[in-house]
Amino acid sequence: MSLPAYDALLQPDAALVVAFSGGLDSTVLLHQLRGWQQQHPQSRLRALHVHHGLSPNADRWATHCQTVCEQWQLPCDVLRVTVDGRENGIEAAARSARYQALSAALEPGDILLTGQHLDDQCETVLLALKRGSGPAGLAAMPLTRMLGANPLLRPLLNQPRQSLEAYAVTHQLVWIDDESNQDLRYDRNFLRQRLLPELYQRWPHFAEATARSAALCSEQEQLLDELLAGQLAELIQADGSLCFPPLMIMSELRANALLRRWIAGQGGGMPSRDALKRIRDEVMASREDAQPRLRFGQAELRRYRQQLYWLPLFRSLRDIELSWPDLRQPLDLPQNLGTLHASSSQSLLRYPQPDEQVSVRFHAQGHVHLAGRNGGREMKKLWQELQIPPWQRERLPLIFYNQTLICVPNLFVTHAGAARDRQGWQIIWDRASREGEQ
């Protein structure tokens, strides 16, 4: 790729961040962007190296990247990650950890650039074929996408590896080779070492043709996105859940297309045909009083009444009890659920007695008598009346004085906790993330 081509992709004052592994692709990319940045001094350029810790050479690679960046007078940060491949395999786990680390290291306005090239695109399409993917999977890697709130750009995607090698030799670049790239147990390496050389020898432009097919699949998916956007918007509720009864009376093809797009929009990727069938049979078609759930990696699909919810997996808080000895200090809740703090702006709760300890729990059972109501009711019935989904019930902070339930902030005050003669206070729950509500 020549330098002028970057002008069509980047603004002169762009803040650029290169995912720099030290391999051929990212070395060429960083070198080219260094030249572009010198022509656009108002722009900024830095590198991020992800240290996976999987190879005995990982420390040496990190040092190499830092040395190259010092020579080129570019900032370089090393991001250390832990890779757990027990669930989805080392390749997928390393990729997930890498992108999470890169995303967390980006600042507002940064553009992340990665070095995938034409041969990588060809491999991605063939792997999608091997998995039996549909058009969305066969569309492979887009030139640009969002990584959280930041753009991710692949400027070398139409360049064959051979041209990158020629560029590196011409400019006397030094790069590292990951020994794991020779391990044929990994599918991508098998394609790269065994299959693709044969295909390229028979059909020299096989990679270009594959990329064209991927682009056509991408266009078809974009068209479907446009055609289904209005109907999908009608089904998605304010909390992000999906109203599913209309899906049950439309064609399976249309229903599956809408489900796929909703799940992808929730960050769940594109589900397989088998996964969609399980959603229909085990979740949508289950009896009305059931509480079906399907796990997908680190998320799960659940149903409550007429809605589907895509939820992150959380550790149970059922047995957690937090002491709140000093009500003048805010109390941070676990798992990013926010903060509790006391306020005298309203007299909703009575003050605790000297012998009453204030605590926060996430589970209660038995009868509860709400302030201003006659008689009590079972907690389960109360949650149903308040339309609180089952998974949220143990993620709401319950305020206790000793063993007596006093209130759930923002929801209700019990008879035992109600203020008398306008002498009292209130507890305010500042939610750090709506994630805790789901």
What are these regions (language model features)?
Residues 1-197, 226:
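Core alpha/beta nucleotide-donor-binding catalytic domains of modification enzymes
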Residues 2-24, 43, 81-83, 97, ...:
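AMP-forming adenylation/ATP pyrophosphatase catalytic core
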Residues 75, 174, 205, 269-270, ...:
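Short coil/loop linkers at secondary-structure junctions
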Residues 130, 200, 263-267:
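Hydrophobic/aromatic-lined pockets within catalytic cores
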Residues 193-194, 198-210:
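Conserved anion/nucleotide-ligand pocket segment
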